[in-house]
Swiss-Prot record:
GO molecular function list: RNA binding; transcription cis-regulatory region binding; zinc ion binding
ZnF (C3H1-type) ranges: 154-181
Biased composition, class Low complexity, residue ranges: 283-297
Protein name, entry field: Zinc finger CCCH domain-containing protein 53
UniProt keywords, alphabetically: DNA-binding, Metal-binding, RNA-binding, Zinc, Zinc-finger
PANTHER family assigned to the protein according to its UniProt record, in alphabetical order: PRE-MRNA-SPLICING FACTOR RBM22, ZINC FINGER CCCH DOMAIN-CONTAINING PROTEIN 4-RELATED
A Pfam family it matches: STL11_N
Keyword RNA-binding (UniProt): yes
Domain RRM, first and last residues per copy: 225-310
Amino acid sequence: MSHRDHGADGWESADFPITCESCFGDNPYMRMTRADYDKECKICSRPFTAFRWRPGRNARFKKTEICQTCSKLKNVCQVCLLDLGFGLPVQVRDSALNINSHYSVPMSHVNREYFADEHDPKTRAGLDYESSFGKMQPNDTILKLQRRTPSYEKNRPKICSFYTIGQCKRGAECSFRHEMPETGELSHQNIRDRYYSVNDPVAMKLLRKAGEMGTLEPPEDESIKTLYVGGLNSRIFEQDIHDHFYAYGEMESIRVMAEDGKYDQSGSNQQQQGSIAHTGLISQQQNQHSQMQQYYMQPPPPNEYSHYPSMDTQRMGAAFSTQESDGSSTSENNRAYSSYSYPMPPHQPYPTPPPYIDIYIYI
C-alpha cells in the first residue's frame, strides 16, 4: 500500500488551536489532547487536527469544530465561531463594519472544498483579504456591543435530558445541569448559519439592541461647548486627550479634575497604598511596596584551595604500594593523608544592607 500524502490531499495539521479567551477558560493548568485528522470541518468538510480540553473545573469539555483555514478566513474562534477581536457574531461584525462577506465563502460542497484548498496557503502567509479583520478599526456600534471581559457561562455543562422529563436519579452527583431548557429563537442556533452570517438569532438580538441604544446628539443650544469625559486613569495625560479629540475640531481648553489622593491613616501600609492604587490616580509601578528586602546580598569570597579532602586532585586515583628504605607501607601513607586536615576559612560577614525607607506618593 502506497504512502498517502495528507498535505497534498488538503488535510490540515496544526500544533495549537485558534480560540478565544472565553473558550480557553480560567484554568491556568489545562490539559489538552490533540488528534491528527480526527474530525471533519463543519464548513469545508476537510479532515483537520482536532483539540479537546476542559476549560474549568465545573465546565464541560470543549473541542474545535472548524479548521484553521475557515477560522482565519472569518477571523473567528474554532469553537464558538465568534469574532476573536470583539467577541461578537459574524453577522453583527459585518453589519457594523459594512463588510459584504455573505458570498465570499461558497456554500456548496464542491466549491467549499475547492475554495479552502485555494486559500489555505494564503491564510498561512497572511496574504488573504479576509484575514485582515483583526486590523480594522471599530466604530461606535462595535464599541457598544463588544465583549470586554471573557464570559465563562457558555462553558457550563449541558442540560440533563433526564432531568427535563423527571427521571434523573443522580441528584447532586449528576455532571449535567438540572435546569429547564430555554425556549424561543435563541434555542435554534446553527454553526453554519453563524459562520455565513445568515439567520443567526444571537446576532439578530444584538442588532435590535444596537438599534434601541440612543445616540449622542449635539444640544440645540450652541453656547454649550463643554464635554465631560469620565473613567480615565493616571496613565492618560492631557496631551493624549487633546490628540484624540483634535480630529473633531479645535478645543479651547482641557481641564483635568483629579480626586484627592490622600488616603485614610487608619489601617496597614498595604491597605493605605491599595486605596490609592484602586482609585486609578497612580499606577501600580509607582506604588510598589517591598517587604523587608535585603539588598547587596553577595556570596562569600572564593578560596584559593579546596575545602574538602575529596576535592584534592593529588589524591584522585588508585594508591600503589611502594618499597621504601624505611619500610613504610601503603596503609601508613593513607593514614598520613587522612590525618591531614584542611583548615576551613573563617566566615565572612555579609555587608550591612542599607536602611529601609518607605516612599509614599500623594497626588
